[in-house]
Amino acid sequence: MEYHPQAIRLCALIFISFYALLHLVEAQDQKGFISLDCGSLPNEPPYNDPSTGLTYSTDDGFVQSGKTGRIQKAFESIFSKPSLKLRYFPDGFRNCYTLNVTQDTNYLIKAVFVYGNYDGLNNPPSFDLYLGPNLWVTVDMNGRTNGTIQEIIHKTISKSLQVCLVKTGTSSPMINTLELRPLKNNTYNTQSGSLKYFFRYYFSGSGQNIRYPDDVNDRKWYPFFDAKEWTELTTNLNINSSNGYAPPEVVMASASTPISTFGTWNFSWLLPSSTTQFYVYMHFAEIQTLRSLDTREFKVTLNGKLAYERYSPKTLATETIFYSTPQQCEDGTCLLELTKTPKSTLPPLMNALEVFTVIDFPQMETNPDDVAAIKSIQSTYGLSKISWQGDPCVPKQFLWEGLNCNNLDNSTPPIVTSLNLSSSHLTGIIAQGIQNLTHLQELDLSNNNLTGGIPEFLADIKSLLVINLSGNNFNGSIPQILLQKKGLKLILEGNANLICPDGLCVNKAGNGGAKKMNVVIPIVASVAFVVVLGSALAFFFIFKKKKTSNSQDLGPSSYTQVSEVRTIRSSESAIMTKNRRFTYSEVVTMTNNFERVLGKGGFGMVYHGTVNNTEQVAVKMLSHSSSQGYKEFKAEVELLLRVHHKNLVGLVGYCDEGENLALIYEYMANGDLREHMSGKRGGSILNWETRLKIVVESAQGLEYLHNGCKPPMVHRDVKTTNILLNEHLHAKLADFGLSRSFPIEGETHVSTVVAGTPGYLDPEYYRTNWLNEKSDVYSFGIVLLEIITNQLVINQSREKPHIAEWVGLMLTKGDIQNIMDPKLYGDYDSGSVWRAVELAMSCLNPSSARRPTMSQVVIELNECLSYENARGGTSQNMNSESSIEVSMNFDIGATPDAR
């Protein structure tokens, strides 16, 4: 059978036209596309972007937080409609978009950021962008007048995807558009990790950017052409791009070739580092009409590594060549070369090129069943906690409030082991979703308004050890299967309508059987009531007497306020002291009208002053805009006027006059430890021995608060900026505004609102609101890591942003040089250093019960110091005081006293 050439060409034309029409239909369909106009009003209908035809919808329903804004009019003419509005996030540290996706699917994810001075502050923000629990990129808007686009190709592992904006400084994260485009799963595959956009060029001198609807996947192609080295080829013929990657026909309709027929086509780019891994995708199509004797064949190499020995592009059909494994370039400089083979009559050509760098996302997402269960519980109770966004368990610094998780390693999905929703204003019955937390060990639903019966399914959670349902309104009988569950501690008191056999509503420690308590418990309860009532009456009369006396001591300034300060003080007791009080005029005089500023903190400005023209002091004035207030002021005055220790900063006096509040301390000439570590104060770098002496003295001050005072005190804000140094570099602990007493007599903690500094904050305290002295131990562990490494506590540019996680990673390599401050130049005893590192990591144990006490810390640090002293190191202008100082528990009163 013979085929007429014209018939063949006609069939080919029909096929190509049909294929083009099919792609046009797909483009118009936008199937699977998610296009969010961030900051649109909730009731705003979807609209088509005039420049692309893409349909954008409001982001309402995809994010639970944030505020809306709009770029200034001066910038509106530069950007398309979807970029004019934005959503910014002034509250919380992590704010997340949650998107429903198809599991195990490659998605092109794009986030667009245009600052446009929307807030009128001319202060472009910088923040981190996370994909699920993993860092994607740091977005820095400084100098980006035209905005920035972040793009990644990522394979989903579940039916839900979180894109999170994380605050890293004082500025608020913001976003204009968020876009997802599903890709074919046989394209852009990697051995591991995701593909971060590096560049995407088509080789043409057209000057036109190309995206949707020309590109059915909405990739954006930028033109690139070197007129000095290349010749441009173009065609008006249709090109078949059915190879899966589907670069747009308009992209493939142009190409570049070397000007010289005998030349080599080359293209180079520079990667961030020599260790950066990348994937390269080369798109070819022969678009020149070849004569009968013409041949185009060339060799493809990348940095001398052969990719294709003899390649000839297909006529009017797209082919994509790529490496199946990630590549690296020496010194980060990459060179792609297309070299003409001896048999070729035509030079090589290149139509389009894509390069992506590899981002490894090592942290696995929380077990999807646990996530579904938690979200079901959240929906049942209508919980809207700002921390309940993104992955519930990871990264650890963003663990959801009230949760505890078991995160053994990055290769295992974290599981939820503890759920604490106490005092969360819950109503209704116990949520069914709780039964799906199959690894739960502790459940605390106390102090809510839950009703109904106690469900039997709680007994089916085999791992449960503690259930606290006290302080609710449950009724009915307790399931027998729950009463008989061995090893379970069941707390039920405070449920008046609950039928409790044998008095078990007082407490039930599961031991396989119920004990008879119907006689003993009423007697004990009656005696306890009498004791409590008597104590309460005695305390009332003592407190009333003290309050009257102390109010007189404080003077009329406590009752003459007409500002906000008075409102704050109306519920506070007066400062219980008869020690030195300065007038505001005296403060003005001692500071020479606030002439010399020493620093600034959360309380307010700190000024240099002198008392009696002889004693230097530091005067801390409460700013009217301060986040701290009279409560913290009062706490610090009362504590410092009652405790005296050589490693606690001394309080000379205070001022409490009208709206003017001031704390007057002894002057610490060498500022704080952080300034010395960072080099801000100049001078020589603190050597290892001096650093050890400073932390020994700081530990002694903290240990005194824990063990030398009655009741014991928790500092709650231990950090390097609160460790002050005098002229001899002796250390004293400062800033006691957040300090709290904690229980003794067998109690282990006090429940309190979380306070402290991010990075130093005990995660167990943050999670449970249970404060004890081990919270200070955790913070002190962070301080130890700072003096060891001289690293920032949180640094998003590190592989592990938090210093504890980073040191943990370095320790796995076993090389102390990776951890130690390089400015020490190895001048230290390695045994001393290792003991200090081990001590720091023990202080940072996730379980407070497994952390050492401050007494143990003092002993261990002195051991570290003895190792270093034995080496023969020299201290820096610091008197030798390395004796071990450990406080004893003397019961000397109800308030802290001098030891």
From Swiss-Prot:
Catalytic residues as annotated in Swiss-Prot or TrEMBL: D717 (proton acceptor)
The name this protein goes by in its record: Receptor-like protein kinase At3g21340
Transmembrane segments: 523-543
One term of GO molecular function: transmembrane receptor protein tyrosine kinase activity
Phosphothreonine, modified sites: T583, T752, T757
Record keyword Glycoprotein present: yes
Organism: Arabidopsis thaliana (Mouse-ear cress)
Topology term for the membrane: Single-pass type I membrane protein
Subcellular location, principal: membrane
Protein kinase domain: residues covered: 592-865
Residues bearing PTM Phosphoserine: S751
PROSITE patterns, sorted: PROTEIN_KINASE_ATP (PS00107), PROTEIN_KINASE_DOM (PS50011), PROTEIN_KINASE_ST (PS00108)
Sequence positions bearing Phosphotyrosine: Y665, Y765
PANTHER family documented for this protein: OS07G0107800 PROTEIN-RELATED, PROTEIN KINASE DOMAIN-CONTAINING PROTEIN
LRR repeat segments: 415-438, 439-461, 463-485
Catalytic activity of the protein: L-seryl-[protein] + ATP = O-phospho-L-seryl-[protein] + ADP + H(+); L-threonyl-[protein] + ATP = O-phospho-L-threonyl-[protein] + ADP + H(+); L-tyrosyl-[protein] + ATP = O-phospho-L-tyrosyl-[protein] + ADP + H(+)
GO cellular component: plasma membrane
EC number: 2.7.10.1, 2.7.11.1
